[in-house]
Amino acid sequence: MQSIALRRFRPPLEATVQLRNSTPIWIAFNGVHGTIAASRGPWRTSGDWWRPTMWDREEWDIEVRDVLYRIYFDVHMDRWYAEGVYD
């Protein structure tokens, strides 16, 4: 079995994302930009629902220029972020 690791960006990097039919098709962040060749998701995650600082997001794995990234849409902030790159 083969495995890959996610190297997280700390903090996550704000991204600009274009959608088609609610699916990311283009992204730009921190010098990376281009058409999304493949994507999987969204996976909905949330936490701390009992607190004012609750979080809720939709995560995607995407491929841009033969590199795999994890991105997410912060539902409460209405913003996209690049969370990390896969090795």
Segment roles from a protein language model:
Residues 1-87:
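Non-catalytic peripheral regions of nucleotide-handling enzymes
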